[in-house]
């Protein structure tokens, strides 16, 4: 009924506000004095340039870009294009650390990049694939990012050839996606060991559900010692249209 729908929308809005408050708090806890941090990084970057250390300059710029994006207002939306750029900066940093041990392969349809999405949905999933998938590999680690536009939907696939996840872990994530007692579920399923962004996979899933009014779908395929695939199906909301 219309009344039930109204109650559901109010609950979802309340939960979204709660999520945003928590994310803002985490952001505030992490930033301390962001202007000082960014100014310092800018100075170091210029010093690296003057000393001819181009790789170091580029690395510092990537770190600053990711930090600035992670500390931005979580109320604003992004485009997939902005999300992809942050992922590329993240991989530049990781490949600086690990060299050819890890390869990043992307196949992206340009007309999908203007789609409007909640901020910080790709980097946490990519980071999860790296940390829990391929980071331990001495060679031949791969993470693939695939983005396409199909039938008024955006399809995003994040595929790694890493260690995979136990069936129990996958089932927990799947049950979380289908959980209807939203606020209780979020409180009882907070990430116990957050990744460096402070935003875990479950948080990303929940924000997708709230932003798209449960019209987003998430699929997970995983096999131990073979890898994991996260597949997102999200409505094609074009920014500015």
Where are these regions (language model features)?
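Two-component histidine phosphotransfer core
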Residues: 1-221, 229, 233
């Amino acid at each position: 009924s219309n009344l039930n729908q109204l109650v559901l929308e109010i609950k979802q809005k309340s939960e979204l506000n709660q999520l945003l408050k928590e994310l803002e708090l985490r952001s505030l806890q992490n930033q301390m004095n962001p202007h000082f941090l960014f100014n310092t990084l800018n100075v170091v970057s210029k010093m690296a340039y003057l000393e001819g250390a181009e790789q170091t300059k580029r690395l510092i710029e990537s770190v600053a870009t990711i930090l600035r994006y992670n500390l931005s207002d979580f109320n604003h939306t992004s485009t997939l294009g902005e999300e992809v750029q942050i992922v590329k900066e993240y991989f530049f940093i990781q490949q600086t650390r690990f060299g050819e041990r890890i390869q990043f392969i992307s196949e992206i349809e340009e007309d999908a990049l203007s789609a409007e999405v909640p901020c910080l949905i790709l980097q946490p999933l990519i980071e999860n694939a790296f940390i829990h998938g391929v980071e331990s590999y001495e060679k031949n680690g791969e993470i693939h990012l695939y983005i396409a536009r199909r039938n008024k939907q955006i399809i995003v696939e994040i595929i790694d050839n890493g260690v995979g996840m136990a069936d129990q872990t996958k089932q927990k994530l799947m049950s979380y996606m289908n959980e209807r007692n939203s606020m209780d579920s979020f409180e009882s399923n907070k990430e116990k060991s957050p990744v460096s962004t402070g935003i875990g996979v479950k948080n990303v899933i929940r924000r997708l559900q709230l932003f798209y009014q449960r019209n987003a779908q998430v699929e997970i395929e995983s096999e131990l010692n073979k890898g994991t695939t996260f597949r997102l199906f999200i409505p094609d909301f074009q920014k500015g249209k």
